[in-house]
Every structure is written in C-alpha cells, then in structure tokens.
UniProtKB/Swiss-Prot annotation:
<protein>
    <recommendedName>
        <fullName>Fimbrial protein</fullName>
    </recommendedName>
</protein>
<comment type="subunit">
    <text>The pili are polar flexible filaments of about 5.4 nanometers diameter and 2.5 micrometers average length; they consist of only a single polypeptide chain arranged in a helical configuration of five subunits per turn in the assembled pilus.</text>
</comment>
<dbReference type="GO" id="GO:0009289">
    <property type="term" value="C:pilus"/>
</dbReference>
<comment type="similarity">
    <text>Belongs to the N-Me-Phe pilin family.</text>
</comment>
<dbReference type="InterPro" id="IPR045584">
    <property type="entry name" value="Pilin-like"/>
</dbReference>
<feature type="disulfide bond">
    <location>
        <begin position="8"/>
        <end position="21"/>
    </location>
</feature>
<keyword id="KW-0281">Fimbrium</keyword>
<dbReference type="InterPro" id="IPR001082">
    <property type="entry name" value="Pilin"/>
</dbReference>
<dbReference type="GO" id="GO:0007155">
    <property type="term" value="P:cell adhesion"/>
</dbReference>
<keyword id="KW-1015">Disulfide bond</keyword>
<dbReference type="Pfam" id="PF00114">
    <property type="entry name" value="Pilin"/>
</dbReference>
Length: 23
C-alpha cells in the first residue's frame, strides 16, 4: 500500500485500513 505495508495505524492509511495493514 501507500506506506509500504507498515505503521498504517498512525498514518493516512488508517482512514482506509481501520483494521490495520494487509499489504
């Protein structure tokens, strides 16, 4: 994903992956 698959919970990815990273 956008963040390379890490720290999604504390990045913009949290808006799209509220359950955490999957990729």
């Amino acid at each position: 994903d956008v963040n390379g698959g890490w720290s999604c919970a504390t990045t913009v990815d949290a808006k799209f992956r509220p359950n955490g990273c999957t990729d």
